[in-house]
Amino acid sequence: MTKLTSNRWWQLTAGIICMVMIANLQYGWTLFVAPMSKAQGWAVSDIQLAFSIFIALETWLTPLEGWIVDKLGPKRGPKLVVAAGGILVALGWILNSQANSLTALYIGAALTGAGGGAVYATCVGSAVKWFPDRRGLAVGLTAAGFGAGAALTVIPIRAVIAASGYQAAFFWFGLGQGAFVFMLAWLLRQPMPGDVRASAMVSSVIQVARSVSPGKMLVSPIFWLLYIMFVLVSASGLMATAQIALIAKDYNVSDSVLFLGATTLTVTLVVDNVMNGLARPFFGWISDRIGREFTMAIAFGLGGVAYWLLGVAGSSPLT
């Protein structure tokens, strides 16, 4: 087992699976909004505040969670932080399944945000450390698990909600996902000195790794430029992700059958998550070859075109 867990490709695979297990927290949320609103009589805006709380905790706690991993060390850190994340993920969705008040829903969102962030920060950080020679590809593959993971469960979640209610979907998927993450956590670790050998891979892009203290990072203009860029890009994507079921309903295409009995919303969610996953390693691979700046320009431009099309032609099921 020691030899297996020392293999960087195994560690990358385990991290990807963990990311798949937390994908529903973000990309499956839209399936629960309308059923919750109908069952509880809550306003959609109040329900979506829970999603905002989830995103805030998922992202803002990652520096702390990454710091804890480093403090605990390469062997214990990933195990303990990801295991804790799995517990929080399960507790959050189980609480959502029992929530009869918005306060309880918000607490559940906070728990899942903290848990999801712990898994995300650890798995992405580990990918960078195991693959200093292929950072873009490794991070892209890891993030692909998060992006595409929900594609596997869109149809099952909708089926459970239709048959047993959204509470059952929250409970069983939350319990299963959290348990899977918890079990995988004990196989994770980060590289020890000497575990990662220099790669002979020839790249057309010079990749530089330099250690910078948090204080120096925070006073660097380039950090704040990148931060603002990623906030804007992520916010636009998350707004579409969280509201896509409601957008489809407003366009009156939600239940339109496209092919083989699959509705527009189901196909949209599956395709969106699959492409979300495939694009991450692809652009990571591209960035290792043409550079991060050119890659971001291409990706951000494509995103802008997609949001424009959603606004002007979204009433067509195929669009």
Region annotations inferred by a language model:
Residues M36, A118-F131, A138-V139:
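Intracellular juxtamembrane helix-capping segments at the cytosolic ends
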Residues L61-R76, A279-G291:
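Helix-to-loop junctions at the C-terminal end of transmembrane segments
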Residues K71-G86, D288-F300:
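Cytoplasmic membrane-interface "Motif A"-like loop-to-helix N-cap segments
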Residues I87-N100, G301-S315:
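C-terminal ends and interior cores of transmembrane alpha-helices
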Residues T142, F146-P193:
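Helix-loop-helix hairpin linking two adjacent transmembrane segments in secondary transporters
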Residues Y27, I55-P63, A150-A151, N273-P281:
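Residue-level signature of mid-helix packing/kink "hotspots" within the transmembrane helices
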Residues Y27-M36, G215-W285:
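Extracytoplasmic gate region of multi-pass secondary transporters
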